Structures are given as C-alpha cells and as structure tokens.
C-alpha cells in the first residue's frame, strides 16, 4: 500500500503544480487582455520620443498599465539608461 500511496500523492502534487502554473498563465493573459486598444500605439510613441533624446535599445524600456480600481489606472514606465 505504501507504494500505491506514493504514486497517488505524487499525482496530487503534480496536479497542484500544473494548476498553479495554469493560474499564472491565465493571470498573465488577463493582464494583457485588459489593456485598452490604444495601449500598443502609446508604447510605440513613448519609445520613439525617448529614443529621440537618449540612445537606447527598445528592450531597455518597459511600459505597463495596472488597473488598481475601476476608476484608477497606473501607467508604469521603466527605462534602463546607459552609463
């Protein structure tokens, strides 16, 4: 019976791990699906303005929009500046 218990408990652990991973994936997809239609263009325009004044690669700039409440959104801009 111990052998059977070992395999059954492992399946539960594997199922829990798979469930947690799926929840992370779904949360990430929801995060990007909730973006307004104008957001990709906003990202491109912000990047072009920054590149006008500072010589940086596009992957050095991240723009995120977080919805805190129904009426509050936070635009977060992170830029890695060269030395």
From Swiss-Prot:
Official protein name in the record? Cell division topological specificity factor
Instruction: Report the function annotation for this chain.
Output: Prevents the cell division inhibition by proteins MinC and MinD at internal division sites while permitting inhibition at polar sites. This ensures cell division at the proper site by restricting the formation of a division septum at the midpoint of the long axis of the cell.
Q: Which Pfam families match?
A: MinE
Q: Which family does the entry's similarity section mention?
A: Belongs to the MinE family.
Q: Which organism is it from?
A: Buchnera aphidicola subsp. Acyrthosiphon pisum (strain 5A)
Q: Which SUPFAM superfamilies match?
A: Cell division protein MinE topological specificity domain
Keyword Chloroplast listed: no
A biological-process GO annotation: cell division
Cell cycle as a keyword? yes
Domain of life from the UniProt record: Bacteria
Sorted keywords for this record are: Cell cycle, Cell division
